[in-house]
């Protein structure tokens, strides 16, 4: 478990707002007690708290790769089960790796596939990438929403974080509970309706969605849907198929 947070504004410089990310990141120390890191750009500031599991020295974040003169920077929380498959495909495309971490695999996957990178990832994840070439922030959440990620768009700012309390440390994010939030607390609490962040200024990126924020537009898109199909097999066929699926899926995890 790691923690990610950050904010951006493509219409003005935010370099003098670094203290905000420090306060936001400090709220996530329980998610990543091993180390912390920051990335600062004229329009983008990222923070990361790390729990080191794979490649403790090579997987430090935020991680930046420079391709064709443009920087791509990621903060990532998760685990990719098919890392070796995605990595091999990228190696075949001519990419090189300098670490053993899945963070680098996710970042290069985005650089090659762009938004479609999520269709190649099998795992649990929430990550944000600053794409300097396209001048955008790309945030994605895993298919079933195991890893949390919240965001707010206000006054030309994008603000995001693994937890609500880190976002509340940003001066633009209000702690006022929304009408929908009150309804959720009274009817569903401690659960929430899909996409609701309880607070007025905060939303949740739903499972199997990505958010792409440009200077003049915002795109929230669903990239995967679980399809319900009529079950027509008998008992023995069902047992064989279930056994097969377990045998191929468990080693990946």
Where does each model-flagged region fall?
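Cysteine-centered catalytic environments shared across enzyme families
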Residues: 1-253
